[in-house]
Amino acid sequence: MVKVIKVIVPYIKITRPLNAAIVGCAVLLGMWLTGFATPAAYGGGAVARNAVLLVLAAMAATAYGNAINDVLDLETDRVSHPDRPLVTGAISTGAASLFAAALAALSIACAAAASLFHATAALIPLALLTMYSIYLKRTRLAGNIIVAALTAYALLFGSLPHPNTKILFAPALLAFLLNFCRELVKDVQDAEGDRAAGLTTSADLPRPAIRLLLLLAGGVHLAAMWVPSLVLGDFGMVYTGVCVAAVLPLHISWMMLALRTDFDKYTGRMGAMLKAEMVAGLAALAADKFIWTF
């Protein structure tokens, strides 16, 4: 039993289970917020069954992206993330590649079992994640934009093509802005390893430019945070209250660190705050829906 666990654990680690779980929650939340029920024209079936399938499809796609990224970023990770399974030798690159392919196939299969529409919709993140790992990660901003867009797409994926998906556009924009900032911070955090591997990323931009991008995106997010409830009226005061109590303090905290000229010393803390803010934002949407539903 112990040997089996030792074999399985590295495969779990390579998927970044927490990130995959957050994506799965975003998909499920999007479906719940819009009251989504898959029409017969798009495959039909029980709502609960389709919800499970689409959550699995999204989580498998996220896991695929992380696995294939580790395969192609092995040299970088030797410096930036020496504890990752491929670097430690817990998994071979061949085994990781096969595992990634299996995850991609699982994502498509689960989405197709829900509907043909979602089978097509699942191909988009898989294609973009592949492009990101092979090429876009090695660009100054394109890769950051793609990953941020895919995170926002997770909130929309489950509810498409339901017309109520429109209420998720503002939250998806917020998710995009927040994750764009997080990707910038991660690039700075991984700068040493990326340079050692000869890669060009957003971390190669001048530090004042990176700080400006963080503050601009963070500032727009701060202003837009209130749009879903106070401007559009798609969500209520519960959403606003959770944002004030949980989202806003985290947002201000990492932005204060971004203002520092030596902000690159605090990327670990900033990254943790940004991830916590993402979870808090999802919680704000969920709490509002829960209160007004029950």
Stretches found by the model and what they are:
Residues 1-294:
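Multi-pass alpha-helical membrane architecture of UbiA-family
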